[in-house]
Each structure stands twice: as C-alpha cells, then as structure tokens.
Curated annotation (Swiss-Prot):
Homodimer. Protochlorophyllide reductase is composed of three subunits; BchL, BchN and BchB. GO terms for biological process: light-independent bacteriochlorophyll biosynthetic process; photosynthesis, dark reaction. It comes from Chlorobium phaeobacteroides (strain DSM 266 / SMG 266 / 2430). This is Light-independent protochlorophyllide reductase iron-sulfur ATP-binding protein. It comes from the Bacteria. Mg(2+) binds at residue 16. One of its GO terms (molecular function) is oxidoreductase activity, acting on the CH-CH group of donors, iron-sulfur protein as acceptor.
Length: 275
C-alpha cells in the first residue's frame, strides 16, 4: 500500500520545486517514489527529469483516448534517484476541466497495475483556488501538505486549502500533515511570524522551514533537484528541511490533523497584527 501525499500551495511560491526536493529526499532514503504533476503547465517534474515530459493527455490524444493502447513507458519518465514521474497535463486554455485530467491519470495508473507499485505517490497540485476538480487528489491522499510563504496572499490561499481538506476529511481519510514554510527570510521577510500564528489558529504546525537561497532558485532553472547540484556553501543547510519532511513522512503513523479553517474576514482582521 502506497503512502499518498497531496501537495498544495499558492501558485508561484516554489511548490513544485519543494515537491521535487521532497520526492528526492524520500527516494534517497530508499523509498520508491512516483511524483504526479497536476498542473496544465506540466513542469512539476522538470527538476527531476531535466525536461518537460509528455503529458497523459498528450499520450491519450495520440491513441484517440483508448487507454488500453498505452503502456507505462508512454506516460512515465524516470529521473533523479530513480524517481518515476508523470505529468497529467491539462485541456487547452479556456476549455475543459484540469481536475478531470487528474482523475484520468489515476485511472490509467490503476489500469496498468502501477498505482500500488510505489512506496510513496506525491501529487503536486495547482492550488490557488481548490475547485472540485483540482481537489480530486485529496480523495486518494493519506496526507495533505501545504506550501506557503510568510505573506498574506499565500496564507489566504492556505486557509482556503484548509477548508478543502476539512471538507474532504468528512468522506475520505485525508489529514493535514502540516505547512512547509518556503523562502524563509529573517532579514527582510519577517521569518515565519505570520505563518506561526496562522498554523496555531487552524490547528496545525510548520513541518519545516526552507530558507530563501539563490541555490534553490538556480536548481530549478538547471532542471535539477537541490540534491543533484554541485556542493557549494549553504547547500547542506538548504537540504536540512527537505530531509526533515521526508523523515517525518516515513515514520510510522506521523502526527496529522484535520484543520479548522478560519473565516476570510478573520484573516483580514489578523493582518493588523502582522505589521
């Protein structure tokens, strides 16, 4: 039985980079990992494979949507540390539902007998607004992880994600493992002062604090995980939070909870205390 993770977060805050490095940390600790990119940009797995791979939708289009004509080699690429990667892709802009594509991807994996092959399956999901479609990975997940930065817009999105997790937990087993604070900057960004307060309010915690560091940004553009980058000053410190997250996830029965989101207006009321 696979450990299934659903990683969400506001767009543009390093969610896919964080997901790829969590996958890398898990793989280097011996887990067989599948990362599933659930974003029409289909770049979630770029740091692992070093390329934009063919999406499930593209593969299905080539066989006129006959699932039975596809094999694992048509939709899965293997990258750094033996991590298998799949990109769901999405419909043309302005048409269709991206969430439907996620469901099709899971169905295809199940038909190919691949879904239970892995120790860990990580869904990296578009997460500014959780519509019914893009919340689909929560139906399969054991744990959700929210990636957030120490700013209002990111926390507002995180609260909406908590609402989705709470709603899904009524019918499904998913719980919130915690929040990963990304791009933490104690010099000009306030560290994690806003995130600490928010996490306490909704009944969760910060799983790890990923520092704001140029090397992490460069690794993304290089098409590599941070683990695959050359050793340079600061690299070891940057790797610590990813290893902390992996260690937490692979322990037996990691502590998790159903979040208790707060109202939108309450978040605005909290803003004054974040000056």
């Amino acid at each position: 039985m696979s450990l299934v993770l659903a990683v969400y977060g506001k767009g543009g805050i390093g969610k896919s980079t964080t997901s790829a490095n969590i996958s890398a940390a898990l793989a280097l600790k011996g887990a067989k990992v599948l990362q599933i990119g659930c974003d029409p940009k289909h770049d979630s797995t770029f740091p692992i494979t070093g390329k934009l791979q063919k999406t499930v939708i593209e593969a299905l289009e080539e066989v006129d949507f006959h699932h039975e004509e596809l094999g694992a080699e048509d939709i899965i690429e293997t990258g750094f540390a033996g991590i298998d990667c799949l990109e769901a892709g999405g419909p043309p802009a302005g048409s269709g539902c991206g969430g439907y594509v996620v469901g099709e991807s899971v169905t295809l994996l199940q038909e190919l007998g691949l879904y239970d092959k892995y120790d860990v399956i990580l869904f990296d999901v578009l997460g500014d607004v959780v519509c019914g479609g893009f919340s689909a990975p929560l139906n399969y997940a054991d744990y959700a992880i929210i990636i957030a930065t120490n700013d209002f817009d990111s926390i507002f999105a995180a609260n909406r994600l908590c609402m989705a997790i709470q709603q899904k937990s009524v019918r499904y087993k998913v719980k919130l493992a915690g929040i990963v604070a990304n791009r933490v900057d104690y010099t000009t960004g306030g560290g994690t002062n806003m995130l600490d307060q928010f996490a306490e309010k909704v009944g969760t915690r910060l799983l790890a604090k990923v520092p704001y560091h140029e090397l992490i940004r460069k690794s993304r553009f290089a098409g590599k995980t941070l683990f695959a980058m050359e050793d340079t000053p600061g690299k070891d410190d940057c790797l610590i939070p990813y290893n902390e997250i992996a260690d937490f996830l692979i322990q037996e029965n990691p502590l998790a909870s159903v979040p208790v989101p707060i109202g939108d207006r309450e978040i605005f009321d909290m803003v004054g205390g974040w000056q």
